[in-house]
Amino acid sequence: VISLQLNPSGMEAEFLKCLNLCFGDWGNRQTYHWYFQRKTAYPDADLMVLRKNDELAAGSAITYRKISLPNEAVVTVGIMTGSWTLPKFRGQGFFARIIEESIRLTAEKKGALVLGFGRTENSSFRQFAKAGAALFPTTYLFSTPETKPQAVASKLKREEKSEPVIKKLFERLSTSGVGFLRFAYSSAQEFSAQFIHRPGETEILSDSYGNLGIVEKKAGTNLLQLFLPSADDESGITSALAAFLNHSLENGRKLFLYSTRADVAQVGKNLGLGVKAGFLPALIADESSLRKGLGIDEPLTTKDSSLLALPATPWHLNPWNVHSGDRA
């Protein structure tokens, strides 16, 4: 018998232990608090644990956020995050149950969509496909021992975390996202809570060409949580990403970033970064909220989330512009 418990008390240590068991070095209590317990402008995260015959088997969280659609309408979404199944219980339908419960919880909060983040090599890819999700391609980029420094015209320097600098980052992020589906931040303060006040130490970096970014340090890796080239073409993206790559390598560190953009992925490959294919699944939760956001009059005859990936329909959700640091 599979039982599901929502927001159980006193489970933090056990849930964290399972995350680290299933994902390797997932994080500590500070990481756990940042992802699941911090107060934001959105509804509190929901945690669920699943048991089989009273034995702990799986768990997941749903965090709630807002995204801007290409027409600038804003809708609430639920994000499946930290979803784990203990090894002995894999392949027994727990992840499918987590997806179902995530849709139900998100719809309760009038959330239009359930989103997630994953690599196509993982079993979750097949599970989301089976659940009928629209699957949008993403890329994980990372330096390898073979990645070499690049010739760059300008070195990065560290910026103060001052109000004007944060405002500049927030405004650049807002303008660079126009025309894309993207995570919405209503103020510089909300932006700062997501990108600057993170579990690890963060740095704001810039160069003389106006390239900007935020790096979070984790072990020996610089996580490029926000990447804002001054020019949004191949040349501009190349010079900006090369600067962040060199900055990491010169300091004896690896570089990692995530992107939903094919042009950023191609530049990363050209610079010698390692690449892993990922996916962003989207499932309809509250259809009326999504319909209203998209400005569609006619309801769907069936709640078919795969329509979201079809260019010929008014339900099409593309292109996405999601940064590494958006994903929580």
Residue ranges and their predicted role:
Residues 64, 113-155, 213-235, 242-328:
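Active-site/acyl-donor-binding loops of N-acyltransferases
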